[in-house]
């Protein structure tokens, strides 16, 4: 029974197990089917989506290909249109060129036609002239045939005249060649003589300056020289015409002026004032007068020394004094007295070499520039003034001619005059002997004073401040105060018209009236 129960139970369990197993299997199968259906649906859905995507991509590619093809076609069409347009433009340009060439050819044809007409006319004129020329030649031949009926003597005379002309020409050539050879030989001899003369004459030259320096014992003396409100320095500048420069230079005062004589007078007067110690306007006037007399005496001594140096005697005392003034005169920076002494010595040496009068040659050389001593005081060139002085003091005619001809203004009438001119050129042309800049500066200052002193009533004028100022001292009885202004204006106008100068020039007219009484 137990076994039966066990079997039944086992069968029941088996049946139940089979049923449960079948149910589980069925459920599992249904789930798998459902999962398979879901997977199939997903696959179908994905396939649809992929197909849709592929379709869209295909459409997009088709559109892009279509756009690309359209663009290529349009570009190709555009390029063809451009080429077509260019071809049309080239054709138009060719047509224009052809038109221009056609026009140019037409003009050339017209020009050629005109030239042909002109050539035809010229040819016609030439033929007419040739015809006239032939007629003239025929007429001349006829006339010559008529005239040629000469006698034997006439033909001989013509031949002799021709021979004479040829001989005269040949003789002139021979004479010219002889003259050239003589000139060459004379040039060689002259150079030899000049070289000997130069070797035997040597002179030192120092370039002149336009300033002098006065040494002071101490710097306090500068204030005394200036004076109260500058009256002392103004008085000294007015009396001498020299510009006093008082600056930071220790224990020194600089005197500036282009006239060496006035500068020397100012230097001596100032040195005497400094030595004396009493410096006031009255004392300054006294010292300037003494200095002027001292300089005049020194000028006379210098003139005598110059004549003694070259061995010249019996010169008029006044001419000796004028000669001494050359010590304070420069020409292009060369001291004129030293230059005259050098010319005198050179002329004497040259005269000795040529057998001429040595003493007379030295005399002419010494006095050849005598006019330069006073050419800034008298109208005329230094040559004209020198001739007048030599004539006035009864110098030899050879000396007078040497003065007149040493610059070629007058023809030399003697060998000595030629020698003086040569010696003058030797002395002046030596390198370093002269400086044109200083001479031009001095000439400008002299011209300033000359313009100022050309007016009536002007007593004296001084160019100072290196030519930047000209001071004119007038006669108070002749020029009143109003006339002083007018005079300054007139002088200013003449300076502007006649002079070339840098910067400005101050024109100062000084009118001073003095009333002097003596108490007894």
Swiss-Prot record:
It is found in: Cell membrane. InterPro entries: HD/PDEase_dom (IPR003607), HD_domain (IPR006674), HDIG_dom (IPR006675), KH_dom (IPR004087), KH_dom_type_1 (IPR004088), KH_dom_type_1_sf (IPR036612), Ribonuclease_Y (IPR017705), RNase_Y_N (IPR022711). The chain crosses the membrane at residues 5-25. Its main location: membrane. SMART domains: HDc (SM00471), KH (SM00322). Residues 70-127 are annotated as: Disordered. One of its GO terms (cellular component) is plasma membrane. Its EC number is 3.1.-.-. It is an enzyme of class 3 (hydrolase). Keywords: Cell membrane, Endonuclease, Hydrolase, Membrane, Nuclease, RNA-binding, Transmembrane, Transmembrane helix. Residues 210-273 form the KH domain. CDD domains: HDc, KH-I_RNaseY. Pfam families: HD, KH_1, RNase_Y_N. Residues 336-429 form the HD domain. GO terms for molecular function: RNA binding; RNA endonuclease activity. NCBIfam families: HDIG, RNase_Y. This is Ribonuclease Y. It comes from Listeria welshimeri serovar 6b (strain ATCC 35897 / DSM 20650 / CCUG 15529 / CIP 8149 / NCTC 11857 / SLCC 5334 / V8). The gene is rny.
